[in-house]
């Protein structure tokens, strides 16, 4: 099947919403949220990432979230917005199986972290190489590597390893939640990652022939919204960040300003975004959902054992991101 190409721009790891009383999936809100983000100009969504509380869901629930997100986008006219699924297990066999289930549910790409439960045995370069390339061999959808040391017992893949793994034709990108812009620069340069057009980056990269033939140019994702502009200046392709659930249009605005060559304005927008994103980062999933509730009228709470914010804490989060939200609300939808 032809896959929707990954484009430069802003992506969000979407939240999974639950009934506040029963903790059952709140499917209408999951669908509404996906469409809101697409209207704001996001060019791709990740289901079942860290922000999506994948570790709190059953496999059946994961498939439901992916399927409902995909169908909501298509029905709203956003069939060109691909769904990426977090599909990580600890074994090669289990990860391939989850990739297949994600594909059946409507995902076009899979986001994969290194196996880490047996870190003493799996945290070496050769084992990680074999893990990712074996999964890529068996997956029906292309893979995006997910370098997130904080979630995988400190395993931090260096640029040499990422470049080596990414020679596989079914591996098409990396998400750098390690926030290492030097590493991102080296990987983006070595793999000829796509970059958005801009007078600030006149030498646009050409796709490697192997990836072009497969219609899969390489994508280097900045993994946190507070270095969106830095990602672009480093030759990166896109941002895939939790803050885009709350302030998507401000994230898109930074990309638009960069593309227009308006660096000073882009830097001013980045400063505002960085301050707000730090509030959301510290407040984590409960705080991000609380911010969505405060400013959009839905959001609710995470599944237990994640704690709910108190009314005072929720009010504090909303107040601290107020300046960014004023700009967010002033910006038009893109689509």
Curated annotation (Swiss-Prot):
Any coiled-coil regions, as ranges: none
Alphabetized CDD domains for the sequence: DHDPS-like
Active site: residue positions: 175
Site residues, Involved in proton transfer during cleavage: 146
Enzyme Commission identifier(s): 4.1.2.54
Lyase found in the keyword field: yes
Pathway listed: Carbohydrate acid metabolism
GO molecular function, one term: 4-hydroxy-tetrahydrodipicolinate synthase activity
Record Pfam families: DHDPS
SMART domains xref list: DHDPS
InterPro entries in UniProt: Aldolase_TIM (IPR013785), DapA-like (IPR002220)
Disulphide connectivity of cysteines: none
SUPFAM superfamilies tied to this protein: Aldolase (SSF51569)
Domain of life: Eukaryota
Catalysed reactions listed for this entry: 2-dehydro-3-deoxy-L-galactonate = L-glyceraldehyde + pyruvate
Family the entry assigns: Belongs to the DapA family.
Function: Mediates the conversion of 2-dehydro-3-deoxy-L-galactonate to pyruvate and L-glyceraldehyde in D-galacturonate catabolic process.
Listed name of the protein: L-threo-3-deoxy-hexylosonate aldolase
Classification of source organism: Eukaryota, Fungi, Dikarya, Ascomycota, Pezizomycotina
Protein's gene: gaaC
């Amino acid at each position: 099947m032809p896959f929707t190409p990954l484009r430069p721009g802003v992506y969000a790891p979407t939240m999974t919403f639950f009934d506040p009383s029963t903790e059952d999936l709140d499917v209408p809100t999951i669908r509404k949220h996906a469409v809101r983000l697409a209207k704001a100009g996001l060019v791709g969504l990740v289901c079942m990432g860290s922000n999506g509380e994948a570790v709190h869901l059953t496999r059946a629930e994961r498939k439901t979230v992916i399927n409902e997100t995909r169908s909501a986008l298509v029905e709203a006219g956003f069939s060109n917005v691909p769904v990426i699924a977090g599909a990580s297990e600890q074994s090669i066999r289990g990860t391939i199986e989850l990739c297949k289930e994600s594909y059946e549910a409507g995902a076009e790409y899979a986001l994969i972290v290194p196996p880490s439960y047996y870190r003493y045995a799996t945290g070496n370069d050769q084992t990680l190489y074999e893990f990712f390339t074996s999964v890529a061999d068996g997956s029906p959808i292309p893979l995006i590597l997910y370098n997130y040391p904080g979630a995988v017992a400190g395993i931090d893949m260096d640029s040499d390893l990422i470049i080596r793994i990414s020679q596989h034709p079914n591996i098409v990108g990396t998400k750098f939640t390690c926030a290492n812009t030097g590493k991102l620069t080296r990987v983006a340069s070595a793999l000829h990652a796509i970059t958005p057009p801009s007078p600030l980056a006149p030498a646009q990269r050409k796709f490697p022939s192997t990836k072009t033939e497969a219609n899969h140019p390489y994508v280097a994702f900045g993994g946190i919204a507070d270095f969106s502009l830095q990602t672009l200046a480093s030759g990166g392709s896109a941002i895939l960040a939790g803050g885009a659930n709350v302030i998507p249009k401000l994230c898109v605005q930074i990309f638009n300003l960069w593309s227009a060559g308006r660096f000073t304005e882009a830097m001013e927008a980045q400063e505002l975004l960085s301050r707000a994103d730090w509030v959301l980062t510290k407040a984590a999933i409960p705080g991000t959902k609380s911010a969505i509730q405060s400013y959009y009228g839905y959001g609710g709470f995470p599944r237990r054992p994640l704690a709910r914010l108190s009314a005072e804490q929720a009010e504090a989060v909303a107040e601290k991101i107020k300046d960014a939200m004023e700009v967010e609300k002033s910006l038009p939808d893109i689509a």
